[in-house]
Amino acid sequence: MNRSDQSERVRRQVIDTAKRLFFENGYDQTTLRQISTAAGVSHGSIYHHFADKEGIFLALVTEAFDEIQQITDREFSEARDPYLRLSLKWAILVAAASIDVRVAELLDIAYASKKISTEIVASSTLRHRNWLGEQLPDWTDNDFYAATLVLKGAMAAVVEDKLSTDRLSMEERIRSVLRAALFGFGAAPDQIAEILERVLDGMARVDPFALYKF
């Protein structure tokens, strides 16, 4: 194994171990020392790849969002409407947070972190522009940025509901997020209603926990 492969192996071990420990113990209760010990790597090796625990968490969150997109692409390859494809991705994330409070807790931490939240919004804004640019040719970068902030706010709100009153059902959370996000991204009311029903029907084909199995 060359040096590059070894370095990537260590990085992978750290992320996978941190993911497991964050779920088992919680983010705040997990230390870098615990991660390095459980991963079987030195403390210095972690700092070679990540500045701090938040950096590991950012890498984990970024991968999770990419994996959700891969699941959407795989399970719904026949869906050509970009609004529908994005809605399915958003719904998978809401479903995972609704089913397992640990997912909601980690998302709550991610949205509360200025560093992580900024990265999520930046990467999501670019993705949304790439996906919806043809549908919204007159939109500027700031238009997509503002709509992404609306989505983030809706996601953060349903996560807060899960962690506080737990009043809404999973379906109600999905409907709430999709209504706000699709309206924010310029979808017509009749289009939103149709997408909502197609997403809820399609969710039966997806295991939201595919992202969280170890």
Model-based region annotation:
Residues 60, 64, 68, 89, ...:
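Hydrophobic/aromatic residues within well-ordered alpha-helical segments
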Residues 104-109, 190-194:
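Short, hydrophobic secondary-structure boundary micro-motifs
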Residues 73-74, 106-113:
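Short linear capping/connector segments at secondary-structure termini
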Residues 13, 17, 21-55, 59:
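Helix-turn-helix
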Residues 59, 70-103, 121-123:
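Hydrophobic alpha-helical connector segments
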Residues 130, 134, 164-214:
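C-terminal peripheral helix-coil segments that are non-catalytic and often amphipathic
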Residues 111-160, 172:
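Amphipathic alpha-helical packing segments from all-alpha helical-bundle domains
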